[in-house]
């Protein structure tokens, strides 16, 4: 067995053993650089996942602005994946990506719903990512 083959097999085994995660991106876009916030959130989420051995199986985007997560097509896809048992972790940049601070009860409801299905919510933004657990209310 060559060294390259051994390395490929090791990577494949690590991917099989890692926890499946969905990266959820819902950010307000700047008028001057509309894709910058989205790219930053996605890059940060992928870095977060890689550093923790999580396997991002899908990236889901929603436009920012709708406070009720259940009215967002992307968030409903997150719920669908959680219900099916396809993911163990939802990665978001910060809590307001799920629901804005003024609607925190909606965020807490969604986090509880995910937790009941064995799914963790993890924040990729550096000041919040230091904790091993997401927000639990």
Regions found by a protein language model. Name each.
Residues 1-137:
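Short, structured surface patches at the beginning of a domain
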């Amino acid at each position: 067995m060559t060294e390259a083959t051994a390395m490929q097999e090791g990577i494949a085994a690590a991917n099989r053993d890692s926890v499946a995660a969905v990266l959820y991106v819902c950010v307000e876009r700047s008028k001057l650089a509309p894709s910058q916030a989205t790219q930053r959130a996605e890059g940060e989420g992928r870095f977060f996942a890689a550093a923790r051995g999580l396997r991002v199986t899908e990236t889901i985007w929603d436009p920012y602005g709708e406070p009720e997560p259940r009215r967002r097509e992307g968030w409903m896809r997150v719920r669908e994946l959680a219900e099916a048992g396809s993911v163990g972790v939802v990665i978001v940049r910060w809590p307001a990506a799920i629901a804005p601070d003024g609607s925190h009860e909606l965020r807490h409801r969604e986090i509880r719903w995910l937790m009941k299905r064995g799914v963790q919510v993890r924040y990729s933004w550096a000041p919040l990512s230091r904790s091993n657990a997401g927000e639990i209310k």
